Amino acid sequence: MPHYNCHSVLCASKRTRGAVGQRILHMLAQGGRIEIEKNQKKRIASVKCLTRDGWHHPGVDLDLFRKLKRKKAVSSSGGGPYRITRRGLELVRSELDNR
């Protein structure tokens, strides 16, 4: 049985989290969007990530959405869905497109 110390497990989870964020940014850069639903108190209740073709993309939760917003990687205009910003495009690391 392999021995893991807390530090290596923590680093692995951060890497995984960063990889998910990069995947979402890359999908947004290709024309995807993040739609939000608010509750009665006008607070964000849930987020849904859609590809440019309208397919639901799993992996975006409230924490990741807030992180992207805090980094100014996504923004909304006129009450519409959240889309990638110029800052978000700078944060995207290039990724091979498998099409």
UniProtKB/Swiss-Prot annotation:
<dbReference type="Pfam" id="PF09857">
    <property type="entry name" value="YjhX_toxin"/>
</dbReference>
<comment type="similarity">
    <text>Belongs to the UPF0386 family.</text>
</comment>
<protein>
    <recommendedName>
        <fullName>UPF0386 protein mll0189</fullName>
    </recommendedName>
</protein>
<dbReference type="InterPro" id="IPR018654">
    <property type="entry name" value="YjhX_toxin"/>
</dbReference>
